[in-house]
From Swiss-Prot:
Residue ranges of the region described as Disordered: 580-606
A cellular-component GO term for this protein: fatty acid synthase complex
Catalytic function, reaction form: acetyl-CoA + n malonyl-CoA + 2n NADPH + 4n H(+) = a long-chain-acyl-CoA + n CoA + n CO2 + 2n NADP(+); a fatty acyl-[ACP] + malonyl-[ACP] + H(+) = a 3-oxoacyl-[ACP] + holo-[ACP] + CO2; a (3R)-hydroxyacyl-[ACP] + NADP(+) = a 3-oxoacyl-[ACP] + NADPH + H(+)
Keyword Lipid metabolism tagged: yes
Organism: Emericella nidulans
UniProt keyword annotations, A-Z: Fatty acid biosynthesis, Fatty acid metabolism, Lipid biosynthesis, Lipid metabolism, Magnesium, Metal-binding, Multifunctional enzyme, NAD, NADP, Oxidoreductase, Phosphopantetheine, Phosphoprotein, Transferase
E.C. number(s) listed in UniProt: 2.3.1.86, 1.1.1.100, 2.3.1.41
Region named Beta-ketoacyl reductase: 651-848
Residues that bind acetyl-CoA: 1746-1748, 1772, 1782, 1791-1801, 1815-1818, 1843-1845
GO molecular function, one term: 3-oxoacyl-[acyl-carrier-protein] synthase activity
Disruption phenotype annotation: Unable to grow on minimal medium unless supplemented with myristic acid.
Record-listed Mg(2+) binding positions: 1746-1748, 1844-1845
Protein name stated in the entry: Fatty acid synthase subunit alpha
Amino acid sequence: MRPEIEQELAHTLLVELLAYQFASPVRWIETQDVILAEKRTERIVEIGPADTLGGMARRTLASKYEAYDAATSVQRQILCYNKDAKEIYYDVDPVEEETESAPEAAAAPPTSAAPAAAVVAAPAPAASAPSAGPAAPVEDAPVTALDIVRTLVAQKLKKALSDVPLNKAIKDLVGGKSTLQNEILGDLGKEFGSTPEKPEDTPLDELGASMQATFNGQLGKQSSSLIARLVSSKMPGGFNITAVRKYLETRWGLGPGRQDGVLLLALTMEPASRIGSEPDAKVFLDDVANKYAANSGISLNVPTASGDGGASAGGMLMDPAAIDALTKDQRALFKQQLEIIARYLKMDLRDGQKAFVASQETQKTLQAQLDLWQAEHGDFYASGIEPSFDPLKARVYDSSWNWARQDALSMYYDIIFGRLKVVDREIVSQCIRIMNRSNPLLLEFMQYHIDNCPTERGETYQLAKELGEQLIENCKEVLGVSPVYKDVAVPTGPQTTIDARGNIEYQEVPRASARKLEHYVKQMAEGGPISEYSNRAKVQNDLRSVYKLIRRQHRLSKSSQLQFNALYKDVVRALSMNENQIMPQENGSTKKPGRNGSVRNGSPRAGKVETIPFLHLKKKNEHGWDYSKKLTGIYLDVLESAARSGLTFQGKNVLMTGAGAGSIGAEVLQGLISGGAKVIVTTSRYSREVTEYYQAMYARYGARGSQLVVVPFNQGSKQDVEALVDYIYDTKKGLGWDLDFIVPFAAIPENGREIDSIDSKSELAHRIMLTNLLRLLGSVKAQKQANGFETRPAQVILPLSPNHGTFGNDGLYSESKLALETLFNRWYSENWSNYLTICGAVIGWTRGTGLMSGNNMVAEGVEKLGVRTFSQQEMAFNLLGLMAPAIVNLCQLDPVWADLNGGLQFIPDLKDLMTRLRTEIMETSDVRRAVIKETAIENKVVNGEDSEVLYKKVIAEPRANIKFQFPNLPTWDEDIKPLNENLKGMVNLDKVVVVTGFSEVGPWGNSRTRWEMEASGKFSLEGCVEMAWIMGLIRHHNGPIKGKTYSGWVDSKTGEPVDDKDVKAKYEKYILEHSGIRLIEPELFKGYDPKKKQLLQEIVIEEDLEPFEASKETAEEFKREHGEKVEIFEVLESGEYTVRLKKGATLLIPKALQFDRLVAGQVPTGWDARRYGIPEDIIEQVDPVTLFVLVCTAEAMLSAGVTDPYEFYKYVHLSEVGNCIGSGIGGTHALRGMYKDRYLDKPLQKDILQESFINTMSAWVNMLLLSSTGPIKTPVGACATAVESVDIGYETIVEGKARVCFVGGFDDFQEEGSYEFANMKATSNAEDEFAHGRTPQEMSRPTTTTRAGFMESQGCGMQLIMSAQLALDMGVPIYGIIALTTTATDKIGRSVPAPGQGVLTTARENPGKFPSPLLDIKYRRRQLELRKRQIREWQESELLYLQEEAEAIKAQNPADFVVEEYLQERAQHINREAIRQEKDAQFSLGNNFWKQDSRIAPLRGALATWGLTVDEIGVASFHGTSTVANDKNESDVICQQMKHLGRKKGNALLGIFQKYLTGHPKGAAGAWMFNGCLQVLDSGLVPGNRNADNVDKVMEKFDYIVYPSRSIQTDGIKAFSVTSFGFGQKGAQVIGIHPKYLYATLDRAQFEAYRAKVETRQKKAYRYFHNGLVNNSIFVAKNKAPYEDELQSKVFLNPDYRVAADKKTSELKYPPKPPVATDAGSESTKAVIESLAKAHATENSKIGVDVESIDSINISNETFIERILPASEQQYCQNAPSPQSSFAGRWSAKEAVFKSLGVCSKGAGAPLKDIEIENDSNGAPTLHGVAAEAAKEAGVKHISVSISHSDMQAVAVAISQF
């Protein structure tokens, strides 16, 4: 059979087999069963590229056949040919024979298994245990030139040897990186001495062959150097190059040449870090040697044993006893020598043992004491008495002046947005809180907002104005009055309901009988039936009856006995309730009106019963404490007054414990600070959450003059008790207060402890609630006594309890409370009554507290018995009443007992009653649940299983909808039209700079996710999804998972599907922990750990060191450096050198410093540029900060809707796209490598220098994305870089050097910068912050009292800016207008970082007596219209003279001159010149009118350009670094600017301090701030500084700034200011304006056309963004320029060259021939020229030329249109494609006709209907009226008209023939 037929048949067979394979089911499970069960196969070998089927077979064996094989003794082998070659071929290692000379070794135990384990761990399949002898030698062969070439290339490319194909040249392999190519060529030159011509273009195999001829087979300088570096930097200490070669020789039998080959291969397999031990190094070498053998096609031999035999375990074995016998004498000698030396040195060798024995005895004694203490007190007690008080952690809140303005503004907008619609209790409560903080600053602030409230916008604005005016009046009235606690909330009662399904619901509902606290006081005074008691007369009558019944007791009937029992009970009850009520000497006659409930009720039941109020005071007598009408009357008067007029605590100092969230104490605390008190409150659970709770409380309730101090405190600790009181009274290191009130409410529950289970917790509780409470009072007494404060006793509100063991199961709780009552007697018996007064409050049932919340459900049932339970609000009101001056005065006379029990003490068996009520509720619930369950079962039986589906509640969980939104476009009628009248056509749009895109990479991901966190303080579901993607927690998957098709998110680690709605729940905690400001994560900074910051210490060695081995080159370098202090000698066997450092040589020894800057703002953990699509080779080449810049550039373009950067070149020339991105420092990683790593001689890329330049990052942007030839400017402005960049970009566009610019800044975080900032004391000290109780997230606190330095951060921020005209033409979104950019330096000084005030010059002006008329936009409009008319007249005159010019030139050059071409070009020039002049006029009178005018400040002028004033700047984003000096200086600068420019009083800016969230990224700072302000413009939401817990008092004087701590939704921001300050006297400011002011310069048609473009672009960007997320392709690097190489110079030199879509590939690229430049108005110009030529060719004719601006015709003015156009022409114009242009053309034509008749125009108001323009080919007008008469008088026979349009104007030529 012929070969060709064989080949054809083989091909056919292969195709058929493959078809069969693909078409048939695999049935592998069945196949396995046949092989394993039916055939019982024991040895299976897989032949294939990987161990696939074998792995499946192993799993099948383990799951199905393991027990079967064990039972049948079947042993199976699963082998794969590419891993188990030796086992398949039965190629076993030779067994070493036993040595005859040591017969006993056979019986000895085998040697340690450790070496064997090491061998098993090695990846080499042929590895075996170390042997007694060397391996058999392998035939040696030197390395080839190709081996070295390929290795050097692979090592430089950081690729495996197999990934470097030999058929490719170096130029192809480096991928266009010329620097890398030059490095490789340099290495080859160093290695071989010389290289062939153009080695970069020669394939590697040819290059190696050409070098082989002159190659000597030895390693050259470069390869030897790399190998030496590998061994010294990655091998363990002592394992030098000689040891490496010796191991390769003895282990594998490799000669010098083969060793070279192995070491060359090792260069391409270099470990990431130094290998830890010698066995691990040998494992690495084994792996390399085996791969070398596989590559070289040789077989490595196993080492053989030396001698005649060897031990099976690899070495001769000896009996340990024999070894011990051999060494016994030696050890004895050593011991003897040691003892002699010790005696000589007078040392006791047993000192340590003796000390240990003594310490053991001491330890036993101490341990016994500890055990005893532990046994007696228990673990809970031990941990519960640990002190926690720390004055450093004290938080002081006193900035009520700032929170007042914040609350007033929030309330204003709440009313405007309809959240507060009616004047309800909540509004009244807010008003009272604002009144309590009333101050002149607040009044000015409110007055401005109310005076400028735009009531025409709707009812809510009118309501806001009405309420605001009323509130202002109220605030004025209380301006000099003390703040008061006044609660206007509705009193509530308990309500427990059980629905039909048996669900128990408890809620607080308003009490119908008490709508306010005044009613509540009345009810408390009235008491109830349960608190009734018999008066004196009734008791006497009852006693007489009882006496009579006793006398005839033996004759009593059954009914009489019952009567006797009832009477007796009444008498006993009356006596027990209040014995002194029947004694006239105490309270007088019962008929005398008393201050009790019966009097208040109006009808005392004299002679029958009276009531005790639910709230009453008791007085002590000889029998105990009894209800006192007199004292109770005083107390109820106080409560009534407090409910009506409020209660002030101004000037009072209070200590509170036990005021945690949800407690009575917290409500009391609110009342105290509302009343102006200074309170120190303690917390046993000190944390950020707790301090934020108290801060929020103070911000809401804190009144003028109040102060809240929060400290950590454990009342179980005696040390804390003393330290706390010392802190309060210490005038230097503490508060320096003298206490007026002590409210010690701290307690811990002891539920479930009866008398037989009193434990450690009970003892601790007793200590807290009794022992240390008394200690606390004692400490206060001692301090008052020591300071001589005898006339200012502190009132103690003792928390008593009615529970005197009544409830039980509460440990020592009742004993603790009962014991407090001894203080009532001690007050008399001890000597502290001058310092402390006692008011004991028996606190009743208070619902919702931690102790009583479990009983809420039965509270309603208990109240039905006639008693009263209390809400926390009510009980706090009761307690605050006890702190009123009247009660305080009573306490100074005698201790006061306040019974606030609500009559609860009158209920017998309360516990049983509660149990019964709870049982009834639960039984009812259970019955209803059972009924519902039964009904459901019945329903299923009757109607089917699925019948309930329609009735079940289904909660629809929202899915993530990741939007990619452009800014909201304003509506024309509501937002733009009101501005259009003044702004239309008033600016030169080519000179207006707008922001069309922005982006950032920072600690919170990107600008979208950062805004979510900044605006709302949390991530949405969409934000979590995007952050999870950014951090690599999830990725998108589209394909099969577990046999099912799946498209969606999967977990990156497990590959398991993750539903987007579950992303927030699953990943949010991790995201928050690893984003933002946090502890430095070493893995993000190449292992940098600030706790172990490495420094080098130089030392001089004092004795010769042991020699070590190095290469000849390295050894000579040591000799060169150290001279005689080093010895070097050659090792003859290896050619290496030994080096010995001698005495006097210097060494640099690393040491670790514990650095205190532990926290920084870091990009989210897991951020990876690969995820965005940046190629691997770029990531390895560039500095990490370059990656930030590249990602930002891609995202900035995407936010502008530009998905292909080459799209710019459809609209502008290559030279008009600029790059102004800058940095403060640049590539810090590159700088670190260049200076530190290079100094330490670490491996480093050769072109590291280029990556350190600050402009390199911009270069990479251009090389990978833009390919532009536009201006590149690289600002370096330290922390102000980004704003300086905006300034440069703005000027570049305004000056016409570019039309598009990328601006922004970037900087990285690096340990060197962190250390030097710390040395300057500029940054926050994390250790100090931790000591002050701050979390990392709190450490950046701009404007606060405790700010302590800025927090470093890293990232990049960017904006894409362009001229407004280009933005409109492209249809890109416009985020904001850049109205002004300025930079400034400062004065003479010596401090580089000192903050300056040079930016004040932005407001520089020296105004005249009257404001400049240029500030009036109407005045400027008049001037502009006048200038436009002049330009049109000039244009008309130039067109009229064209023919004469042409005739004159033709007369001089009759042959070559073409009149038509000349006229065409000149007319186009006139048209262009007219447009230029008009734009110049717009620029001069619109954009630029204020420049060089000392009467107008740049800031004022920039705003006036858009019709705005300084009062309309809504927000200011501050540099706000959280340093003491900057925050104060910056606020001062802004305030001075506003004041100087006449901003109205009270019109305070809202301050944004973004760095509390992001930290300070230096170069990127201004860009992030600017981005945030653009988001504020779009949303109207002003984010607050959430870390502003207490604004510094020094900021109060800056009255033009509000410092919000929470986000405030406004009704719109018109303009903003961004200020930025940088080290080195850099100050910068940017003013941004809402884009609606730009749209107001357009007409409606232009705006609608733009809107359509933007919407189309947004859809395209949305698709691109989502594809980028799914495919990791947001960044797409360009591989080539948009033009072919041969077109480069043509494209560069032709400013009109533009790209076009390639018909085949759809790529944007420059066509071979530039498009013919066409003037937009060429056709219209041609028509004008033809008309003029016709006119000059016609005798007896007169020409009229008129030019009109298209936008000068107001077509919306119907009256005007009626006067100039008849109905037929109006209809024609309205139907035209551009009605505006058509109307302008008709107007121009009529004016031209007038001019051709020789009649002067009568102006815009003249009726032009007399001239009717026909639409025929001649365009002959029909004249009527005055026009017809004028034509008749002039003898006009015929008139023709030609009309033409351009984008901006209409030109008409009329010719009248006579």
